[in-house]
Structures are given as C-alpha cells and as structure tokens.
Amino acid sequence: MLTRRTAIAAAFTTPLGSRVSFGSTRRTLKVMSNANVAGIHVPGNVAVREILQQIGDYAPIDLTRMEKQANITQVLVGGGPDIVDADTPSIAAAANAGANLKIVGQFYASVDLVFAANADVVTSLQDLTKPDVVCGINTPGDTVHALLLGVLMKHGIDITKVNIVALGGSSARMRALMAKRVHLVPIHADQAHDVALQGNYKPLIQPWTEYDFWSNEVWAVNGKWLENPDNQRVVVDVLEAQLRANRSATNDFSWFAGMFRKYSNDRDAAHWPDDRIHDEWTLLTKEIKAFPEPMPLDLAAFNTLIPIYEKAGIVSPGASFDSLIEPRFLAEAQKRLG
C-alpha cells in the first residue's frame, strides 16, 4: 500500500543526476534575495540569472528583492517562492518556532562585513563597554547582531555593558556614524575605503579573522516544497549553477570584474577601475575565501553558531540545525562538476 510516508521516501530516492526538463515550456523559478548586491553577492546572482538558464530548461527567474532578509524567511514559511537567499539566523529562528524549512546550500561562505569604528573614541573591543559608546546594528536578533556578539563573547567582553541600538539599514547606520551618534557600525568591506576618507574611521573587527566558521546567507527552501522530486532536481540545478559561478569568481578576475560591474548595486560600480575591483576580488577570494570549492554544508559547523544565537535571542536553549541542514543536493551538484 502506498502511503504518504512511503511516497515521500520514494521521492527522496529519486535519481538527481539528470537536470530538469519541462518539455515544451521552460520553468520560471520564483527567487527571493537580498536587495543589496555587494561583491560577495555577485556569484549567487549570476548563478540564478545567467548560468541556471544555460545548464537547464529555465526561463529568466521571477526575482523579488527585499531590504530585510527576515521578511524573506517569513514569506518562505508561507510557501510563496521556490528558493530564497536568506540570512541564516532568521531561518534558524523560524525553524526553532516550528517552521518546516531546509538549508540546501550557502549563498557564499563566511562574511564580508567589517565593523567600522570612530577611532577617536574606540580603538579596542574593551572600549565598547564604556557607557558613552554606542554600537549601531540593523535589527536585534539579526545576523549582524549575532556576528558582533560572537566576537565579543570570544574575547571575554561583558556584553551586558555594550550599548547596542537598532538603526535600520546601511544608509541610516552610516549617517549615524558620520554624525557621531554611534561609534561602531557594520559595513561591507568594499565600503571601507570610502568611509575612511570621511574621517578617522577604521575597521575594528574583521569577522573572517575571528571565526573558524560563519554562515551569513544560505539557499533555503520550504520543506513541503522539497518533497516534490522535480523540485529536488531544481535545487541541484541551482546549486550546480552556484558552484560554477563560484569557480569562475575564484579563478577568473576578468569574469568577476565584468559581473561585478553588471550586478553590483553600488551606484558607481560600472565605473570602478580594475585595480579597485581587484582589491575586492583579492579580499573575497584570498582572505575571506567566500567562494570555496567544495562549498561546505557541515552540520557540526552550523551547530557551533547556536550558543551565539541563544545570546542574541534568536533561538531558545537546546536548539540546533539538525533538522535544517540538507546536504544531499549540494553533494549531487558537486558530483556533476567532478
């Protein structure tokens, strides 16, 4: 007798090696992603906007961008998009609250954010505990909040003495820093050069030097959606496209430079000179190692983030990534590439 349980089991044993074919029509994937496109986001964007259509039977994607990544996760819980680029903490929080979600790959590895400080006031982590020093973040419980707390915890800083305020998006944070209303804010590494020209602002924290593992953004899907064998093969195709983009970004500066100018939403990106993009490329590929091959999706590594998430109020005590990480599709995509 074929029950729902046995049907699902059969679906997960369906061979994934072949790419999706939809006959006479091409499938239009509904993708949700971060509104910001910095250098670290370029391969993921190229993957679903160009490479996916080259390797499979896909039309141009139906792309929706959102300023707040937590909103992407909320929509995914409701089952709207096919696949999303979401921040890891909000996916963990939703799963902790009972949502059936799956992390199937990383949008990139590590993180390119730095915490820029007003160096007239802050020159060490301990300075952040001074009563008149204020740290600006986007939203309590978001990935930036967790990122900061993890570094403070690592160095034994009393986080109860650190004044952290929510300021919203990057523009608001930068205005507050320049106006000296706050003394530490997160910025993308490719913004550090411009920020330094505005005054005595210096990177205080470079998270990729602090963490052995950090996951900032992931490819995630709704667990119910993933029960469909066709959707499983879609995930493999997306991840293959991501891996191909990662490989090009890492090994071919000219490719990265061209795609950066095409997809970055920095208003001047199209006119960035090669040497400036080369600095960004070197940082991402050599120091941060944002596009590694193979791209890891290791459960034990993800679970090292849980104590930080607990401190940030993202998940409850005893939470884990055990039910969230689904590595089979990434393994199949990597097998395709050899």
Q: Which residue stretches match the model-derived regions?
A:
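A generic alpha-helix surface/boundary motif
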Residues: 42, 46, 88, 146, ...
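Pocket-lining segment of extracytoplasmic ligand-binding domains
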Residues: 172-268
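Short, glycine-/small- and polar/acidic-enriched structural segments
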Residues: 24-168, 173-176, 183-189, 203-207, ...
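Secondary-structure end/capping motifs
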Residues: 229-315
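Predominant activation on well-ordered alpha-helical scaffold segments within soluble catalytic domains
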Residues: 92, 149, 193, 239, ...
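N-terminal secretory signal peptides and thylakoid transit peptides that target proteins
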Residues: 1-14
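Conserved C-terminal helix/tail region of periplasmic/extracytoplasmic solute-binding proteins
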Residues: 302-338
